[in-house]
Amino acid sequence: MSGRIHPTAEISPDAVIGKDTSIWHWAQVREGARIGERCNIGKDAYIDAAVVVGDDCKIQNFATLYRGLTIGNRVFVGPHACFTNDLYPRAVSPDWKVIPTKVEDGASIGANATVLCGLTIRRFAMVAAGAVVTKNVPAHALVAGVPAKVVGWVCECGRPLDAKMQCAHDGKTFPELRVKRKARSRSRNRATNFH
């Protein structure tokens, strides 16, 4: 695949675009942004100044990636997903401070999800469509809802894991996730114990 930049895309001369990356209609990439190799940036996507996007990423139409965001390799960002960067937003604010956010390798952010700033979404985690992420997301976790909560676990291929933390699709198992699952269940049981 060879990359292409659509003539309507607005790319800052100070942005770095990796080899074989495609940028589609009316996308905007600001100064100091770095986009890796073999990425696909969808129509009307907005990539703010100094945002870092790794290799082999797919940023869908109308996704909004604000300053302070670092995205690893092979990350999927769905259409209309939004990453914020200010804890106390105001139209005019002399003390505006960018709060960094990180998405690790292989994670997926669903359509129309909102990720608040200052968080880390760990490797191969999956954020469901429409979720509002207000806390860090563990590796391989499937989070959904408003606010987003862990509702399951996923394989590197994105498919759900069973109770034994095994993927029915490719047979991979993740025994390290069993420990996390048990710890989460114990803390949840303590929180609901009213005795």
Regions found by a protein language model. Give the residues of each.
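Short, low-complexity, charge-dense intrinsically disordered segments
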Residues: 193-195
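Assembly/interface hotspot detector across virion components, adhesins/toxins, and nucleic-acid enzymes
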Residues: 143, 161-166
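Short Cys/His-rich metal-coordination motifs, predominantly Zn2+-binding knuckles/fingers
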Residues: 157-158, 169-171
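Short, non-ligating residues that shape and space the ligands of small metal-coordination modules
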Residues: 162-164, 174-177
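Cys/His-enriched microdomains
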Residues: 150-153, 165
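Structural signal for interior beta-strand "rungs" in well-ordered beta-sheet cores
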Residues: 3-144, 149-150
